[in-house]
C-alpha cells in the first residue's frame, strides 16, 4: 500500500501546499490524480464529481496538469506548437504559425511575461519552460495544476515571478497543488498546507 490514511481537499482557486518528508507514495499520488488507477479502498473526486472509487475504476484520465522540475515539453517543437497543437482535442491539420502566435499573445500579456512564441523549446530557459507548461495547462482547460519541486533550478527572482503567475491564475479560479520540501516557501505562497510522511497525510 503506497497511500494510506491519505485525505486532502483542494478548493477552487486555492494554492494547496504539500510538503513531503520523503518520496514514498508520491509517484502513486500523482499517477492517481491523472489516470484514475485502481484503488484498494477510497474515492477520488474532481470538480465535485466522483471520478474513481475502490469498487470500480473508470480508467479515464482527468484534466489535471502536472509540472515537474524536468520539462515534459517537446524540445524540438515551438512554444505555440507545444501549447496549442499538442493539446488534447486540437483537430486542425493546417495551421498558420502566425495565427497561433496571435492566439497566445493575450495569455502572455495577461501574465506580463515575454516568451518568443515561435522559439523552439530547446532554446528556452528553465523558467520559461515552467511558464510555458503553466500556459499549456491553462489553455487545455486544466482546473487543477500540480507543480512539483519547481524551485530547485530557477533563481529567487524567477521563483517570485512564478509565484505571481500562480496567484494570478488562482484568482481566476484555477486550483494548484504546490509540492515543495521547503516549509518557508510553502508558507509564503500557499493558502493551506499538509505534511506527507510515508504515503500518509499528517495535518
What are these regions (language model features)?
Residues 42-53, 58-62:
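Conserved ABC transporter NBD signature motif
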Residues 133-134:
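Hydrophobic anchor residue at the start of the ABC signature
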Residues 180-181:
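H-loop/switch region of ABC-family ATPase nucleotide-binding domains
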Residues 188-195:
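Conserved catalytic segment of ABC-fold P-loop ATPases
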Amino acid at each position: 500500500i503506497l497511500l494510506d490514511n491519505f485525505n486532502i481537499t483542494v478548493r477552487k482557486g486555492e494554492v494547496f501546499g504539500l510538503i513531503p518528508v520523503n518520496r514514498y507514495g508520491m509517484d502513486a499520488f500523482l499517477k492517481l490524480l491523472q489516470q484514475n488507477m485502481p484503488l484498494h479502498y477510497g474515492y477520488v473526486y474532481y470538480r465535485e464529481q466522483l471520478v474513481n472509487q475502490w469498487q470500480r475504476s473508470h480508467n479515464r484520465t482527468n484534466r489535471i496538469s502536472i509540472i515537474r522540475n524536468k520539462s515534459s515539453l517537446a524540445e524540438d517543437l515551438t512554444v505555440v506548437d507545444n501549447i496549442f497543437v499538442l493539446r488534447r482535442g486540437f483537430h486542425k491539420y493546417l495551421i498558420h504559425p502566425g495565427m497561433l502566435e496571435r492566439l497566445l499573445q493575450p495569455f502572455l500579456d495577461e501574465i506580463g511575461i515575454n516568451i518568443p512564441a515561435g522559439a523552439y523549446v530547446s532554446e528556452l530557459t528553465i523558467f520559461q519552460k515552467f511558464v510555458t507548461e503553466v500556459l499549456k495547462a491553462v489553455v487545455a482547460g486544466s482546473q487543477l495544476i500540480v507543480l512539483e519541486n519547481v524551485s530547485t533550478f530557477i533563481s529567487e527572482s524567477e521563483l517570485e515571478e512564478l509565484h505571481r503567475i500562480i496567484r494570478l491564475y488562482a484568482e481566476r479560479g484555477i486550483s494548484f497543488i504546490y509540492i515543495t520540501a521547503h516549509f518557508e516557501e510553502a508558507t509564503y505562497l500557499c493558502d493551506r498546507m499538509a505534511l506527507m510522511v510515508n504515503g500518509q497525510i499528517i495535518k
